[in-house]
Structure formats: C-alpha cells, structure tokens
Amino acid sequence: LREDRRHIHDNDAIAIIQQSSLPINLECSINNDIIDIVCKLKPARATLVPENRNEVTTEGGLDVKGNYEKLQKVIDKLHENEIEVSLFIDPNEEIIELSSQLEVEFIELHTGTFANIYAMLHSNLAQTHHSIKELELSKNELKNRLNKSIKEIQTSSKLAKKLNLKVAAGHGLNYQNVKLISQIPEIEELNIGQSIIARSVFIGLSQAIIDMKELIKND
C-alpha cells in the first residue's frame, strides 16, 4: 500500500484481509497516513518498503540508516497494534544489525540485483530493448557478479539468523532463478508474485503454484 496507490488501493487491502483465512503480510510505505491505515486494518505482518514516485516497482531496500528514527516510531506504533514487522532491505551486514536494533521480527532480503544479473546471464534479455545497460558485461564478469550476489545473500541470511531475525527474500524471483535462493537454509519465506501470476495466464493459478512449490522444495 503506497502513497500513490500504484499497486493496490485501500479497498483492495480491506477485502483481502477480511476474506482471507491465511495471515496477511501487507507491504506498505512508512508514510504516516499509510501506517494509520495499516494499524486500522491489522494485518498479521507489515513489511515496510521504500517508495519512490518515479519507479514502476520497488528498486531497492529501505534506507534504514537514514530513516532510523522514523522507522523506530513506525515500528513501535505497529507493535502497539500487535502487528508483526518486517523490513525490506538490501543484503548488507550493517543494515541487518540496524534492523536487529529496531527489534523487528522479520527482514526481507531484496533479491532484485541477483535476479537482474541472472537474467542478463541466462536469458535473452541482453538482446532486447529491456537490456540493463549497467549489466551489459562479459559472461565471465556476470558469473562473478552473480556468485558475489548469492554470497551476499547467504552471508546476510546467516547474520540475521544469528541475531534472531526471521529471514524472507523476494523481488524478481521466478521459475528459472528461484532454486539458487531457496537452497539457502536460513531463508524461511519467499515472496513471489509476478512470475506466478504471469504463468497462471497459460496454465491456471493452481498449477502455477504447484510448479513453484516443487521448485522450492529442499528434500
């Protein structure tokens, strides 16, 4: 739920929370008016995300350091309303330590950088007009960057667990790249939306979910 209501409107959030038998994790900005609405709706969890009016979708993690005092007030208010809190952050050790100090229950690691590198390396993205200019690199360089990105997510997940934070991951995850992230043992939740819905257009939502669940199994 954003200030610009780009993704969902208030009535969408109300309908989902009132009709779902499952606990709802509501992603929202840290704007005071939005937080007031979230406190009235009382989802099981609120995931705090950054909001940039010029972006189509969330492009990076929260600036926890720059918004520390603001986040503390928002988190306290959500906790007062018995709402669990998660912070959507980049895989960075300093940010994870700050998140722990803020006493949130969850962090969600931003996997967008990993997903972009993976797509430029393993798909035809580089040959299209959607190519990511800063990632138009040699295959060897992309492989090195992909390994570095995975390592950052692994290291961040381990630190978070050590600090008693629950770990989720999401952004850009799909049927091609998800296994590399789902194999990280500290990650207990994956937030995946667009790729499942896109696949469901062709095979139905039920089968799209079944296919994803098969991929993320770690037997």
Language-model features: where?
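Glycine-rich, proline-tolerant flexible connector loops at the mouths of alpha/beta enzymes
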Residues: 1-18, 50-63, 111-123, 140-141, ...
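Alpha-helix-loop-beta-strand connector modules within alpha/beta enzyme cores
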Residues: 5-32, 66-86, 131-168, 212-219
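C-terminal helical cap(s) of enzyme catalytic domains, especially alpha/beta-barrels
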Residues: 17, 60, 119-136, 198-219
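Hydrophobic faces of well-ordered beta-strands that scaffold small-molecule active sites
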Residues: 24-28, 46-48, 85-87, 107-109, ...
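Active-site beta->alpha loop and helix N-cap motifs at the rims of alpha/beta catalytic domains
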Residues: 29-65
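Catalytic cores of alpha/beta
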Residues: 32-41, 92-103, 169, 173-187
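Histidine/lysine/aspartate-rich catalytic loop segments that bind and position anionic ligands
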Residues: 90-150, 156-159
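C-terminal alpha-helical cap/extension of soluble enzyme domains
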Residues: 161, 167-219
